[in-house]
């Protein structure tokens, strides 16, 4: 077929597709500049920098996993609070039946406006999530956790019954349905997941996440959260030092790390993160135990500097803005990549 005939045939095919499926069903990527990805701040400037965009991407699936008490739910609740501050509507699907409203309120969550569901089964949880996504009204949905999404057949069965692959098939089916709807509605979906160990692994890490391989494929961002140190004030334990590895990122360069402090009862220390990242970026000067910013002494020792920034929110906001500008953090048009998995998911993946 000659070049001109091929173009005519393609134009006719595109016209038929648009007539049948609507305008924009098929388009050339170069025809129109895509808008930058919208984001929901994570609550930690170090994590925002590691994510490359300044937060969690809108319209995508995010998986947060790690050992028990590592800070997974805390990170998710900070995202909830930030989405609400921007005027967004958020749902929290509490499959573990373990949400602490008082702790969530301490982190800045508007618990009165938060939609909460405590489903009876995995099918019910994912069906509720799907209906909320398709309403187009939600900005963020958190599911805590994948391990607690127990299939109905397992709940109704006997204790010793075998249910191989049931949960993996449930997750695979749900994610196939929801991924496109998430992108259309610009709803971010955060799955909190637990770690398990494979038996008989001789080489490599024996750790794996629950729920099969589908979530690994469909997630645009995967975060590995670990507690690395206990923070003390004298002999009192006041918090944890947490490290987050971005093990997968389809919207910015992956494999970056972030460290931040989680204070007991208060959540992620925003001011501590500003000090740490400010020192790394060269905006905050550390001389001995003293921290200074543009000639202003923030305090002697990190705790005093943290308190100074807490008492001076305008200065903290200015420092945050300068850090993000200097590090070039923010959504860009050409960082977005394909949304679908690079390889198909087969029966052997369950």
From Swiss-Prot:
The keyword Transmembrane does not apply. It comes from the Bacteria. ATP binds at residues 66-73. One of its GO terms (cellular component) is cytosol. InterPro entries: AAA+_ATPase (IPR003593), DNA_recomb/repair_RecA (IPR013765), DNA_recomb/repair_RecA_CS (IPR020584), P-loop_NTPase (IPR027417), RecA-like_C (IPR049261), RecA-like_N (IPR049428), RecA_ATP-bd (IPR020588), RecA_C_sf (IPR023400). GO terms for biological process: DNA recombination; DNA repair; SOS response. Keywords: ATP-binding, Cytoplasm, DNA damage, DNA recombination, DNA repair, DNA-binding, Nucleotide-binding, SOS response. It is found in: Cytoplasm. GO terms for molecular function: ATP binding; ATP hydrolysis activity; ATP-dependent DNA damage sensor activity; damaged DNA binding; single-stranded DNA binding. The keyword ATP-binding applies. Belongs to the RecA family. Can catalyze the hydrolysis of ATP in the presence of single-stranded DNA, the ATP-dependent uptake of single-stranded DNA by duplex DNA, and the ATP-dependent hybridization of homologous single-stranded DNAs. It interacts with LexA causing its activation and leading to its autocatalytic cleavage. HAMAP family: RecA (MF_00268). This is Protein RecA. It comes from Nocardioides sp. (strain ATCC BAA-499 / JS614).
